[in-house]
């Protein structure tokens, strides 16, 4: 199995280490040629979403990756990656891939709680460690979106067809269960194409 990892900015190395420990080949995606390579899954890591969005376009990666996501390529998106997938951003006109029917608020926890750690229930996996770093959260979800996790009432994890979006960083805690769930969804072929929306 080969998974593409967006590697233009952000915490991509940590994702790669977990995937490699799970026996998965990683392809770092750094330019348009990389973005057009065949992969069986895609990781959109944390980082700075505005910078990532700008680089995706400048490096000719935006359209080929968006086409893959729309066609049903399984995606695991964390923190900034969630922002890239979101159809709508609160108090922000910016839009990126816009393939995940959720409304996301950037830096939702403010400066005092900009970074924190907790353990909460995640789908059927039980309690998992969650590290939040200047994290967004999901204000609302559209039809067909499964809520996987909440922290103090705020939605921090969702699944929609081929896309898993997380507010937190599962790659920073050494717990492999979420990555394994993502890989299992690839192996099981559970992902499905998402509806095309105009950008």
UniProtKB/Swiss-Prot annotation:
Pathway info: Cofactor biosynthesis; pyridoxal 5'-phosphate biosynthesis
InterPro entries xrefs: Class_I_gatase-like (IPR029062), PdxT/SNO (IPR002161), PdxT/SNO_CS (IPR021196)
EC number: 4.3.3.6, 3.5.1.2
Annotated GO MF terms: glutaminase activity; pyridoxal 5'-phosphate synthase (glutamine hydrolysing) activity
Domain of life: Bacteria
Keyword Hydrolase found: yes
Keyword annotations of the record: Glutamine amidotransferase, Hydrolase, Lyase, Pyridoxal phosphate
Keyword Hydrolase: yes
Family: Belongs to the glutaminase PdxT/SNO family.
PANTHER family cross-referenced by the UniProt entry: PYRIDOXAL 5'-PHOSPHATE SYNTHASE SUBUNIT SNO, PYRIDOXAL 5'-PHOSPHATE SYNTHASE SUBUNIT SNO1-RELATED
Function: Catalyzes the hydrolysis of glutamine to glutamate and ammonia as part of the biosynthesis of pyridoxal 5'-phosphate. The resulting ammonia molecule is channeled to the active site of PdxS.
UniProt name for this protein: Pyridoxal 5'-phosphate synthase subunit PdxT
Name of the gene this protein is made from: pdxT
């Amino acid at each position: 199995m080969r998974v593409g990892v967006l590697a233009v900015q952000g915490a991509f190395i940590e994702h790669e280490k977990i995937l490699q420990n799970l026996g998965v080949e990683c392809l770092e995606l750094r330019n348009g040629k990389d973005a057009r390579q065949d992969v069986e899954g895609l990781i959109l890591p944390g980082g700075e979403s505005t910078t990532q969005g700008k680089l995706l376009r400048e490096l000719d990666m935006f359209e080929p990756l968006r086409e893959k996501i729309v066609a049903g390529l399984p995606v695991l998106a964390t923190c900034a990656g969630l922002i890239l997938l979101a159809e709508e951003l609160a108090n922000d006109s910016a839009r990126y891939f816009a393939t995940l029917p959720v409304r996301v608020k950037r830096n939702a926890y403010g400066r005092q709680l900009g970074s924190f750690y907790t353990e909460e229930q995640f789908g059927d996996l039980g309690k998992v460690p969650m590290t939040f770093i200047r994290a967004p959260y999901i204000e609302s979800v559209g039809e067909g979106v499964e809520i996987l996790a909440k922290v103090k009432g705020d939605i921090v994890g969702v699944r929609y067809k081929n896309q898993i979006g997380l507010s937190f960083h599962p790659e920073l805690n050494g717990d492999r269960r979420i990555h394994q769930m993502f890989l299992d969804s690839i192996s099981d072929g559970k992902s499905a194409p998402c509806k095309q929306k105009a950008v």
